[in-house]
UniProtKB/Swiss-Prot annotation:
Keywords per UniProt: Carbohydrate metabolism, Cytoplasm, Hydrolase, Magnesium, Metal-binding
UniProt name for this protein: Fructose-1,6-bisphosphatase class 1
Binding site for substrate: D115, G116, S117, S118, N211, K277
Pfam families found in the cross-reference section: FBPase, FBPase_C
Species of provenance: Pseudomonas fluorescens (strain Pf0-1)
Amino acid sequence: MSRVTLSRYLIEQTRSNNTPADLRFLIEVVARACKEISHAVSKGALGGVLGSMGTENVQGEVQKKLDVLSNEILLEANEWGGHLAGMASEEMDNAYQIPGKYPKGAYLLVFDPLDGSSNIDINAPVGTIFSVLRCPNEYLSQNEALDEKAFLQPGTQQVAAGYAIYGPQTMLVLTLGHGVKGFTLDREMGSFVLTHEDITIPESTQEFAINMSNQRHWEAPVQRYVSELLAGEEGPLKKNYNMRWVAAMVADVHRILTRGGLFMYPRDSREPSKPGKLRLMYEANPMSFLVEQAGGASTDGHQRILDIKPEGLHQRVAVFLGSKEEVARATAYHKE
């Protein structure tokens, strides 16, 4: 039986689910950019891409060389194809305008070019996260400048989302709103090949991911919930849990999509004015779309993440996502 490449899968989606051709082409371009980023990541010190740039992004985070390179790869790959009206990146202050010499398309691309970049220098998994939205009609004119407001749509408006994870294998995990598929990069073929069909998250789990070093800063509902997880069989939840933490959302969520679990990045008392650390547009929305399509759930502790109306490109949010049973429990504790 012949293997199903990403291109073939997207063509079949065009036939069976009326996926627009422009969206298919856009996903293929993003996938090609991810292959290029994967190649750069795999070269490591041999490619001269390790270390920091000595600059900070809009988040106040020190930019790694690969952060900047990955951002440039995604911009250059996608700006000329005629599929996009604009782009927004975690590494850039403002929305990216499609140069006037190129045609505009009907979609907006939002991305974190290299999630978990603190892992680069220790050779641990990193990844690229992306989200696709439809551009509002008023911005589709060639003469209309694109501004931030075009992107400020709730996660329910996403038409596609996914991530590439650069680990022992490079994988692309994708949803077009009809379930979640996983594609592994065959380096000999140069193609992403469908290897994981109908990825599904179990409703219950015995695994969770959280940065325990921040425990003293958590709010009371999170303190209570995690203490119950750690209490194991002797505690109120009556079962033992294992904790995992890779310090890259893309890696932790990939594990949860693969075998179940709960990912938590709650707000804490160090910056009470901020509702969380992770970015709604670049990280929480695309990952929540994937998790829900795989049968899981995602909230900020109070409401469904995909229902949140963004107020800014770089808005932050608390995140609880993964197996439905545990997400529901953590959310219920916040409401008591």
